[in-house]
Amino acid sequence: MMENSPKTRRLNILPDNPENTGDGVVGLGRFPSWLHRPLPKGNQLQITGQVINQNRLHTVCEEAKCPNLLECWTKKTATFLVMGKECSRNCGFCDIDFSKNPKPLDRSEPSRVALSVQQLGLKHVVITMVARDDLSDGGSSHLVEVIEAIRQTNEDVTIEVLTSDFEGNRKALSFVLQAKPEIFNHNIETVRRLTPRVRHKATYERTLSVLEQAAQKKYHSQLKVKSGIMVGLGETEEEIFETLLDLKRVGCEIVTIGQYLQPNRQKLLVKSFVHPDIFKKYEQYGLSIGIPHLYCGPFVRSSYNANLVLMRANQKEAIVNSE
């Protein structure tokens, strides 16, 4: 049998992991203890939901069935999903609705996002987008309109964008970077070997190219470049190390690593529930190779506690600059 075949490849499973079926697929009926947590309390959850619904907006929290929705909405934070809720791609991990012909852009959306930011009193806002390969600029101009609308009514708000790869359109990407968000995020999602299966319309190298272009900081010297990885899809520890090295090479400064959870039965199976000790191992390795900021854990998602991530990054940078 070949050395790199799935049957012999070492998965990120510790001995106490539940229900290993023998083929690397972990039974989904029982989550390990570290994937259980208490529900948050308080009425802020309803308040956040009301603001979003009244302004006719979408969030990735809802559309992608994020496990952190209750916690984040209780903390009065949400990741706005712009350009509709229909994506022109149908990635193997994502629960957002797929459409070959997404609905036209809503030109009132930027002002409604800005109003929601104001009503929620946000200090840091995360804007993500569906892929819009049906548009000549991939939706970059609409994303910039959202950024500008937020800034017009919320001067002190910091902005993080989580974008598609714009099909490699460097001009479209430059247009977004010129809007000077504080954080530019584009997720690599998985290791090189698994990319064709996990993100069939994206490529590993294109993602690195997008991040590298952003890391040049041509328009905004204080821009921080961020990317995220899902684990539990069948990758090995060595492949995660290689991916972290690639992210470091192209200038990525913030990396998030979290557990993949199957959003519905049509999507990719979970191959392993990764133990918290392994997440700590990834964090320590990333720091050892010079990535300044890593946030790794079972419930970590690319925009999870994004305001705290930016605050800690700025604090660490200030300490380094003062030495």
Swiss-Prot record:
Gene3D superfamilies found in the cross-reference section: Aldolase class I (3.20.20.70)
One Pfam family it belongs to: Radical_SAM
Entry-linked HAMAP family: Lipoyl_synth (MF_00206)
Cofactor annotation remark: Binds 2 [4Fe-4S] clusters per subunit. One cluster is coordinated with 3 cysteines and an exchangeable S-adenosyl-L-methionine.
InterPro entries recorded: Aldolase_TIM, Elp3/MiaA/NifB-like_rSAM, Lipoyl_synth, rSAM
EC numbers on record: 2.8.1.8
Residues that coordinate or bind [4Fe-4S] cluster 1: C61, C66, C72, S303
The protein, known as: Lipoyl synthase
Similarity comment: Belongs to the radical SAM superfamily. Lipoyl synthase family.
Pathway participation: Protein modification; protein lipoylation via endogenous pathway; protein N(6)-(lipoyl)lysine from octanoyl-[acyl-carrier-protein]: step 2/2
